[in-house]
């Protein structure tokens, strides 16, 4: 929405924000640093939890894997809750402070349990009720906190940028994603190396220190930030508009004068989208602004829905791709053996190098196009979806090659073969998630920035859950045909390559669906 450029911002004292003193690059840079630190904590613990659940809490591998997947998915899904709080009741700054404290308390609780042998199960025993209660309380306190942080930080950073400068907003979101990738890289290299040398418990210790430092850094920036005060629940307003439009669906059309008024006020928006919403203006208590905001938000949902399958493909990096790596030759030299999680570092390094190049060439490509917020980012997302289809095809070829060499030649191919799928999926994620964060922020109504940017993270969550469901459905269907594609514990006896082909087909169909909605937007 472009009609939000006249928004009023305040400083931390409640006075009108002063350009040059409040907001700007300095304030947005603080947000990028905090995003990097938050992502170090989230990713490092995502890798650490599997070892912790299996080694210290004595859960089975399958249970531990599901616990991690559920934690990751829930964390991303709760960004909608965090976004709702930020847009409806308090500022993005306050949302961050509250949810960061919640995550920090959950992390401290898990660290305390890890250091206290009495709160851990004895050898070869499962956790007691008390031990499980402490574990899940700390775990999902972290998930709640993560949801609030990931929802509030991009919007808070975007609010620091002058919206009359679309290029600067685009640059901010490019470097925001650079910060996310930097956090991932540090997590899978430095933190993982310390964990391998010093033990998994160090991951908790480091995470507490980093998150506490991030909280302090973010708070120190208070005098430099500018804030937009929320004015009630936007979701409630949307519900009222939809209900009113439904009740008035059989009434006469809006008169020509009112329609002209709508078009003149929102001439930058496509008034032909969701015209049935206009019926809501027959209710005198509903403003034309509320109708247009509802139309805008509902128009984002098909784009959001079209990215979930791609997120399902990305989820394979932490599931089957990791299992493939365990069965491959991990030695790079005679004595050096690369940990499978560290394979992620290779595409991350490439992405960190490619983001500045992407920003440069993207700016050249979009020069003279003032509508980068929609058409440019829609093309960026579409390219990411297309690349994920290619990555699944490559994954199928690599798995077929790996299994053929093991079964017929008793030879384990190098783990570096996985770099191709890691690389393409990571670049696909950069294009899609990075594009979604900017697209949803730029296009969202002014009072729904956090909820709308949370849609990008929510897509990732639903992708994780869809992956779990798809595996179960695939096994159920193929089991009836005689042999489960993904059944059993021996990956060499599965048909993982066919599952990758299935994902390739589904994602290609999803790409066609996305193109349909993107053209209509």
Swiss-Prot record:
Expressed in siliques. It is found in: Membrane. It holds the Pfam family PTR2. The keyword Ubl conjugation does not apply. The chain crosses the membrane at residues 30-50, 65-85, 89-109, 133-153, 172-192, 204-224, 297-317, 338-358, 381-401, 413-433, 451-471, 498-518. Disulfide bonds: none annotated. It is a multi-pass membrane protein. One of its GO terms (molecular function) is transmembrane transporter activity. Its main location: membrane. The keyword Amino-acid biosynthesis does not apply. GO terms for cellular component: membrane. Keywords: Membrane, Transmembrane, Transmembrane helix, Transport. InterPro entries: MFS_trans_sf, POT_fam. Involved in abscisic acid transport. Belongs to the major facilitator superfamily. Proton-dependent oligopeptide transporter (POT/PTR) (TC 2.A.17) family. This is Protein NRT1/ PTR FAMILY 4.2.
């Amino acid at each position: 929405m472009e009609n939000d450029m006249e928004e009023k911002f305040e400083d931390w004292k409640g006075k009108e924000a002063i350009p040059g003193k409040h907001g700007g690059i300095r304030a947005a840079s603080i947000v990028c640093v905090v995003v990097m630190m938050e992502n170090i904590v989230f990713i490092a613990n995502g890798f650490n939890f599997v070892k912790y659940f299996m080694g210290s809490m004595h859960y089975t591998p399958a249970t531990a894997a599901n616990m991690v997947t559920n934690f990751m998915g829930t964390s991303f899904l709760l960004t909608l809750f965090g976004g709702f709080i930020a847009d409806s009741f308090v500022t993005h700054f306050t949302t961050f402070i509250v949810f960061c404290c919640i995550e920090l308390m959950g992390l401290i609780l898990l660290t305390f349990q890890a250091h206290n042998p009495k709160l851990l199960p004895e050898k070869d025993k499962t956790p007691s009720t008390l031990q499980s209660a402490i574990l899940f309380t700390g775990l999902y306190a972290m998930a709640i906190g993560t949801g609030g942080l990931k929802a509030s930080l991009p919007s808070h950073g975007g609010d620091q940028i002058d919206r009359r400068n679309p290029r600067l907003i685009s640059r901010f979101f490019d470097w925001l994603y650079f910060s996310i990738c930097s956090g991932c890289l540090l997590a899978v290299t430095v933190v993982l190396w310390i964990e391998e040398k010093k033990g998994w418990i160090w991951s908790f210790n480091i995470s507490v220190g980093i998150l506490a430092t991030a909280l302090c850094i973010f708070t120190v920036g208070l005098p430099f930030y500018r804030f937009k005060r929320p004015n009630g629940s936007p979701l409630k307003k949307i519900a009222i508009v939809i209900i009113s439009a439904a009740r008035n669906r059989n009434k006469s059309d809006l008169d020509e004068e009112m329609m002209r008024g709508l078009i003149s006020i929102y001439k930058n928006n496509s008034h032909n989208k969701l015209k049935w919403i206009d019926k809501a203006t027959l209710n005198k208590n509903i403003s034309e602004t509320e109708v247009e905001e509802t139309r805008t938000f509902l128009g984002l949902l098909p784009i959001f829905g079209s990215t979930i399958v791609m997120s399902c493909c990305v989820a394979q990096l932490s599931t089957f791709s990791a299992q493939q790596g365990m069965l491959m030759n991990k030695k790079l030299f005679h004595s050096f053996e690369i940990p499978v999680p560290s394979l992620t570092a290779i595409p991350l390094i490439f992405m960190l190098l490619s983001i500045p190049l992407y920003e440069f060439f993207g700016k050249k490509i979009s020069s003279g196009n003032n509508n980068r917020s929609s058409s440019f980012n829609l093309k960026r997302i579409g390219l990411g979806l297309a690349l994920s289809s290619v990555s699944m095809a490559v994954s199928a070829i690599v798995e077929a090659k790996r299994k053929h060499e093991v079964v017929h030649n008793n030879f384990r191919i190098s783990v570096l073969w996985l770099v191709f799928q890691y690389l393409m999926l990571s670049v696909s994620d950069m294009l899609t998630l990075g594009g979604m964060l900017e697209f949803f922020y730029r296009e969202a109504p002014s009072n729904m920035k956090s909820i709308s940017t949370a849609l990008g993270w929510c897509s990732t969550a639903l992708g994780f859950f869809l992956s779990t469901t798809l595996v179960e459905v695939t096994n159920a269907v193929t089991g009836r045909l005689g042999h489960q594609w993904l059944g059993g514990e021996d990956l060499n006896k599965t048909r993982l390559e066919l599952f990758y082909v299935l994902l390739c087909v589904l994602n290609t169909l999803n790409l066609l669906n996305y193109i349909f909605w993107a053209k209509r937007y």
